[in-house]
Amino acid sequence: MLVAIAWFGARVARDHHWVHDPGARATVRHGLLSWDGAFYADIAQRGYGALPRVGLRFFPLTPLLGRAVGWLGVGPRTGVVIVANVAALVAATLLVVLLRREGLPAATVTRAVWLFSLAPPAFVLVFGYAEATFLALAIGVFLGARTQRWGLVIALGLLAGASRPSGFIVAVPVVIEALRTFRAAPHRERAAQLAAAASPFVGAALYLAWVGHRFGDALLPYRVQTRANLKGSFTDPITSTTDALRGMFHGHIGTALHVPWMIVVVALIVVCFRRLPASYGAYAAITIASAVTSANLDSFERYALSAFPVVIALALVVRAGWQSRAAIALSAAAMTGYATLAFLHAYVP
């Protein structure tokens, strides 16, 4: 509903010529399939071969699922949006199951799910993006690893690795949880633990192997990802942060706005390490590190949402009562604002 309100507001602004960016006309017209959603929809409909090579950086799981849903009569483009929305509901449900399993109070669980669903970048969960699918898989991996159900982790890890370029990061909590019992485990369980830790890499490798066979360069998805006009090359976080701040004085205010969020997220990662099992903090830290070591910080907030333990940490920090209600209300307002800016082509989701 909030995303629909944002889209309607953006459409009104466009129709009344309050916005002069020509890109706004396209993003409003494409709606939930704007920005990267257009790539996922095009891949689902026409395949990688019909797109420029830059399309290879979008891993295949979401387009494949969208195409499968499209066979039900809605078409692959609508199928991609349906997949994202269903996955968002699955992710929220699994988060409830996971946090209850961790023994958190019911009020904290409820607060965490609301903050997760209404986080400022959470509007992308209903876009035709891979975020919702990956988050559902990542939370499922955590649930499987924390309960030592390695067969489940293997299956979900394979899919997570095929869902996005950094999907293999879900191996981090798997390794940490496996090490807790590895020495005492029987040989068969050790083999399952090793397979579970390797599964996200195998999922990614299967796609890369296909790319190598089809296009002659298995690493092409990562090579195009590091182009200067996309994520850019790897750099140290201090340099990327300094460049973002410097951009504020050259008219790139949107880039500088990532910096306050970076500070908040780092603080919440500290909370993760202090108040949650080690696997949560490690996963969040490595996910954020991969985001801030890119020369281009665009979409930082979206990548931060993938580090879902930071949302759990926020739910632990915010107290019940007026603090909780205020945090949820402010988050919902921020999400609506960011979604509006994305539809107006003023913010890169």
Question: How does the language model describe each region?
Answer:
Residues 1-18, 32, 171-180, 184, ...:
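Membrane-lumen/periplasm interface segments of specific transmembrane helices
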Residues 68, 82-103, 267-268:
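Transmembrane-helix motifs of polytopic, lipid-linked glycan transferases
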Residues 126-133, 300:
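Short acidic/glycine- and proline-prone juxtamembrane loop motifs at membrane-interface regions
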Residues 56, 60, 64, 72-93, ...:
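Loop-to-helix entry region of an early transmembrane alpha helix in multi-pass inner-membrane enzymes
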Residues 198-201, 320-349:
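Signature aromatic-anchored transmembrane alpha helix within multi-pass, membrane-resident enzymes
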Residues 117, 138-143, 151-178, 199-205, ...:
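Membrane-interface alpha helices of multi-pass inner-membrane proteins
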Residues 31-74, 234-239:
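Short hydrophobic/aromatic helix or loop-helix immediately within or flanking a transmembrane segment
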Residues 95-118, 152, 278-282:
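Transmembrane-helix signature of polytopic, membrane-embedded enzymes
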